[in-house]
Amino acid sequence: LDRAAMAVATRNTGYPVVALVKQLTALAGPDAGRWTHWGATTQDIMDTAVVLQVRDGLALIEAELRATCTGLARMAAAHRDTVMAGRTHLQHALPVTFGYKVAVWLSPLLASLDALPRVRERALRLSFGGAAGTLASLGDQGLAVTRELAKELDLAEADIPWHVARDGLNEATCWLGILCGN
């Protein structure tokens, strides 16, 4: 693939898919090339690519989050009897233990870990509906193609095409915001 040509074309169209499909079609030749973009829209391809990136990113974040939680849990246990001054309104308060303080840091991170399966369920869905979201170009094979594509990409099938319904990706973004806020 000519990445430089793809970069120029992407700047012109705003979508890398157009240039990619053009090159893949040329590489596939006239017989196979006509099927390169069959059934899917540019939006389907872009959204599915984003979902694949989100999936990989969430896996990396989960690994780091689990390691952080493990470290904090160990620290909380190790310092469960280490007394320190509590703080309230930027002033000394009643004594607490450092282990308690660390457990307070740990608690919202564990809540984020608990929420992650639901975030994945909502965000990691295949986008595949075709031009109008009806899979019409695939005839009576639309649902079967969707099922196989979702299986191949290890993504959930969407109940309905989500070209304009961004809630799943929004939930993943909100989850990240909550995690970072903690």
What is each PLM-predicted segment?
Residues L1-L135, Q141-E148, E157:
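A helix-coil-helix interface module used to build multimeric assemblies
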Residues A144-L169:
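TM-loop-TM module centered on a large, flexible mid-protein loop between adjacent transmembrane helices
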Residues G168-N182:
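A conserved active-site cap/scaffold subdomain adjacent to cofactor or substrate pockets
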